[in-house]
Amino acid sequence: MNKRNCIFTAVFAFSLISAASVFAQSASQKLEHQTDEKDAPIVYFTKDVSSEGLMKVYKALNQKKQGKVGIKVSFGAPDEDVLKPALLTDLIKATDGTMIDSCGLSGNRWTAEMNLAHARKHGFDRVGSMQMLDEKSDIDMPVKKGYLLKYARTGSHFDEYDTLVSVFKFRMHFLPALDGAIKNVTLCLGSRSGKCLIHSGGSDSKHYHDTKPDVLEKSFADALRAALDYKKNWAFINVVDSYEPEDSCHGAKNTGNIGIIASRDPVALDQCSVDFVARTAENAEVRAAWEEAHQVKMLEYAENLGCGRRNYRLVEIK
């Protein structure tokens, strides 16, 4: 190893150690939206980032299996750092679930077969069966008293599932919009047409729009309301593991494996995930900048629509 590589390795290792140190020092401190209120939704957390760890928090949710089980994941782009398929092994065995996703707007995710090819490349086919929801046609899910959308749109195969489990690789410092459970069951659940509706605030179902943040945040909230009303039996799991930040946020770092978090409340789950990552910010001003950059206000809009609550009780499972 040459001198330059040695220096890079040392710096990278130091950054991971520093992130772990921050996490350890604050482990006994309450998170930003953590509460002791008895009526607050429960969020379960384990540091065990494994298939067994994921099953621990899933079992704690006590979701009753009804009919066919769909496990909503994102198969991702060809070179994307996606959820590790092996984490789903025990969940799929326990539920006999099918991994489901929808097509994307980019050229390499345009068709069902393209997406399934990426899924096979990432290894999802080695842990269970897969289905693209929108390989045939679309269905509309009504939005009741939303901000902008009249309906959200996904693939017609979604009607085949009665029990839904969202499992997502949570990333705060990735794309502009927060990468969590809400995104997984709104934009990622949407068919190509459904994605266009969200990006346009409901005005266009055929073309992508580079939308203002508040329009996108409200559209996410509307689409979440639609998904929760259309299918009642949901569980939500975020895997908050190691990844390299891909944005320009000041002070953003690889936090290493924080853990796996689960809840029946998607708003509480995403807020808790944000709180775990955002507490590594060097001060309140930096945290606020991170949250603004990644449109965290969508959680407030979703809460106001009755999709969940941002304050939560945290229960650690060891």
Give short role names for the model-derived ranges:
Residues 1-10:
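Bacterial N-terminal signal peptides that target proteins for export
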Residues 28-318:
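Extended, low-polarity segments enriched in aliphatic/aromatic residues
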